[in-house]
Amino acid sequence: MKASLLSKLDILQDRFEELTALLGDAEVISDQAKFRAYSKEYAEVEPIVATYKQVLKVQADLEGAQALLKDNDPDLREMAAEEVREAKEQLAELESSLQRMLLPKDPNDGRNVFLEIRAGTGGDEAAIFSGDLFRMYSRYAERRGWRLEILSENEGEHGGYKEVIARVEGESVYGKLKFESGAHRVQRVPATESQGRIHTSACTVAVLPEPDEQEAIEINPADLRIDTYRSSGAGGQHVNKTDSAIRITHIPSGIVVECQEERSQHKNRARAMSWLSAKLNDQQTSAAANAIASERKLLVGSGDRSERIRTYNFPQGRVTDHRINLTLYSLDEILAGGVEAVIEPLLAEYQADQLAALGE
């Protein structure tokens, strides 16, 4: 391992010993906020230090076995050679595991998200494809045990959505979906096409992490225009009786959010404010993320909404992710919720890039 990594591990080992002492301190135990913070840090550092100790032990075993390779006894040399081989394999696995543990954690990975899907070029066909993408993510959410709720929808004239916004809640939602942001292109023969010509349409997907209440951007109420209107969404006859839908305009940025799916105006307002906070936060962070991605020549992780990231070709049954040159001939399975087949290689590529940066 590189000297820079070893230095980092030595510092972590010292910190681990310090945390162990702190968690046994009566003053810390009596302060719940400090105790929770130190306990969380301990839980993050402990597996790294434990693996590092394993690495040091295997390195010592390897050195001992290598010394025996010079012994006069041929049987002992043969046994030592086998021990050297096994120790080297074990060391490679442990060091790889250790490097992954040292990768910088994205603080947003565990967050819920706001999922925005909008039809782009292609008219009715783009709206229909928006519906296909929304079903794909909905079924993927079901497979992972996530909860998905529609906040706002604008249906297409011939099916699908001109725009659909949903909130997805569950374990590591942003960590899984964060690379889905961008332009998704579809190539297929529309049902109305009599000549059998392939049409190309596009939709944009945006995945925004939902901020915690404590971390939400402070919004000046004077900067907001709040309108209420009658919901056109779910709710049966009730929607005709009250103006429960909410539209919030953030005047300085021009960002508009709408929430119409809840019967309660209060709930719609709370959801809309949370979504607005996510969009304002995204506006602040996306420029920095794009700058980092550009500097390091990254495609995965740039999050550029205008970047064409994926093509779904129906005649060939093909899905191609252009960022990592991944092509899969399993379009039906992916659209049925099997998008993990694309997500996992993207995450692996991103991790490989992080590992390369870690060793720089």
Swiss-Prot record:
Keyword entries, A-Z: Cytoplasm, Methylation, Protein biosynthesis
What's the main place this protein lives? cytoplasm
**Does the record's keyword annotation contain Protein biosynthesis?**
yes
**A single Gene Ontology CC term:** cytoplasm
Describe the processing and modification events after translation.
Methylated by PrmC. Methylation increases the termination efficiency of RF1.
Q: Which domain of life is it from?
A: Bacteria
Q: Which family does it belong to?
A: Belongs to the prokaryotic/mitochondrial release factor family.
Name used for this protein in its record:
Peptide chain release factor 1
Source organism per entry reads Pseudomonas fluorescens (strain ATCC BAA-477 / NRRL B-23932 / Pf-5)
